[in-house]
């Protein structure tokens, strides 16, 4: 039996045990995971450094290396995320609706686990723990398929989590890492309908497209983040500058970083914003008017408006009004996160009604599109589709429902 099928069998069996556990049993297991990750951090960082060294040798971009790297600070955040998930209410068993029919049948809709979730992701070892903690909390088993570039890190993290589970009610086979990262095995995983209930791809456009186009297992699609900020005519100067700097520079390599800033042509502080960005080392690519007016702005191509840079590069454009900004976002956006900075409430309402995106912001950075920032604990991904879940996906997004019907002998006669 192949590694894939062997682990899929184990996961399916483990999911049946998981579905029967109490919230207390699952929370105790998550606390054990947090403690063991903390205790084994030296081993985890050592294995991560092997991936980092290989990545540098292979010429991975700074953005990819940043996503790949684990540090003590990032491990602290990962461990805190596990504990935050443990502290959240367990959605499993929640009665969503309840009613009684005229014939006396009492019907309940309750929340239940999905079953076995397949995670497909790139060089993001934090996803290994985030996904596992969310899945275990919701009674789901999880098959993790990371990238070759993060294999040492992922093996270490999964080994540590499995060690932690050995003293808990959750079987250690509820978490499995697919160590064969070949394309052929991935394609087989995408068609494992008898074992996997859903696939969740998390990564770049190529990875997501590959899963969506090749999977027969249902896909909960996450999307790339070509995020925009529209600085309206009434935007307050310092607020606008601080929001744009945060959205671009706090962590440029993530999907909720801003990639294009649209500036109202009558906003009086455009020069201040652009010069500040330039001084902070941001490469600016602008429309013809901006490229002509500022020697440090190169002229943008059509491709620039579509690009998720994941780097300190920013496309900038002057627009006549909120409607032109909305039109630009409709054409080039990826329905992820879009923001408007303005003191004009009419324009806020227009922007919120007209822009189709998972998350919309007024006077705030796009960087808040994140499960932890939304209060979900760690996130399984950020969905840009409209069915089942949209936006940062926390616990509820990886559950489904079933109906429980209580009778007293009723039979159907019509």
From Swiss-Prot:
Reactions that this protein is recorded to catalyse: L-glutamate 5-semialdehyde + phosphate + NADP(+) = L-glutamyl 5-phosphate + NADPH + H(+)
Specify the enzyme's EC class, one word. oxidoreductase
| Cross-referenced Gene3D superfamilies | Aldehyde Dehydrogenase, Chain A, domain 1 (3.40.605.10), Aldehyde Dehydrogenase, Chain A, domain 2 (3.40.309.10)
Free-text function comment from the UniProt entry: Catalyzes the NADPH-dependent reduction of L-glutamate 5-phosphate into L-glutamate 5-semialdehyde and phosphate. The product spontaneously undergoes cyclization to form 1-pyrroline-5-carboxylate.
Q: What is this protein called?
A: Gamma-glutamyl phosphate reductase
As for family, the record states: Belongs to the gamma-glutamyl phosphate reductase family.
Q: What is its EC number?
A: 1.2.1.41
Molecular function (GO) terms for this protein are: glutamate-5-semialdehyde dehydrogenase activity; NADP binding
Q: Among its keywords, does the record have Nucleus?
A: no
This protein's encoding gene: proA
Looking up PROSITE patterns in the UniProt record yields: PROA
Look up and give the organism this protein is from: Geobacillus kaustophilus (strain HTA426)
Starting at the broadest rank, the lineage of the source organism is:
Bacteria, Bacillati, Bacillota, Bacilli, Bacillales
- List the record's Gene Ontology CC terms alphabetically: cytoplasm
In Gene Ontology terms, what is a biological process of this protein? L-proline biosynthetic process
One Pfam family this chain carries? Answer: Aldedh
């Amino acid at each position: 039996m192949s590694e894939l099928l062997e682990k899929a069998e184990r996961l399916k069996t483990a999911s049946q045990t998981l579905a029967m556990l109490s919230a207390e049993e699952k929370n105790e297991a998550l606390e054990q995971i947090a403690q063991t990750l903390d205790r084994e951090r030296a081993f985890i960082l050592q294995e991560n450094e092997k991936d980092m060294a290989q990545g540098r040798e292979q010429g991975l971009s700074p953005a990819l290396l940043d996503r790949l790297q684990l540090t003590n600070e990032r491990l602290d955040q990962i461990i805190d995320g596990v504990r935050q998930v443990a502290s959240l209410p367990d959605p499993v068993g929640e009665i969503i609706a309840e009613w009684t029919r005229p014939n006396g049948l009492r019907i309940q809709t309750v929340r239940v686990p999905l079953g076995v979730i397949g995670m497909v992701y790139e060089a993001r070892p934090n996803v290994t723990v985030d996904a596992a903690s969310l899945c275990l909390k919701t009674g789901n088993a999880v098959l993790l398929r990371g990238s070759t570039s993060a294999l040492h890190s992922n093996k270490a993290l999964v080994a540590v989590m499995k060690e932690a589970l050995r003293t808990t009610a959750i079987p250690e086979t509820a978490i499995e890492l697919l160590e064969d990262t070949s394309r052929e095995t991935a394609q087989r995983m995408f068609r494992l309908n008898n074992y996997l209930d859903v696939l969740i791809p998390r990564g770049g456009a190529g990875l997501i497209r590959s899963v969506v186009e090749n999977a027969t297992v249902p896909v909960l699609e996450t999307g790339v983040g070509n995020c925009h900020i529209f600085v309206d005519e009434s935007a307050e100067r310092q607020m606008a500058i601080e929001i744009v700097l945060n959205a671009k520079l706090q962590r440029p390599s993530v999907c909720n970083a801003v990639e294009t800033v649209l500036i109202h042509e009558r906003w009086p502080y455009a020069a201040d914003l652009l010069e500040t960005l330039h001084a902070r080392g941001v490469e600016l690519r602008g429309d013809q008017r901006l490229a002509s007016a500022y020697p440090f702005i190169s002229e943008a191509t059509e491709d620039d408006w579509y690009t998720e840079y994941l780097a300190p590069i920013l496309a900038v454009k002057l627009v006549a009004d909120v409607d032109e900004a909305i039109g630009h976002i409709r054409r080039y956006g990826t329905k992820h996160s879009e923001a408007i900075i303005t003191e004009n409430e009419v324009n806020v309402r227009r922007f919120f009604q007209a822009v189709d995106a998972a998350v919309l912001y007024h006077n705030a950075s796009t960087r808040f599109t994140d499960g932890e920032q939304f209060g979900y604990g760690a996130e399984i991904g950020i969905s840009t589709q409209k069915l089942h879940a949209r936006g940062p996906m926390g616990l509820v997004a990886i559950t489904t429902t079933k109906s429980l019907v209580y009778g007293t002998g009723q039979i159907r006669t019509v």
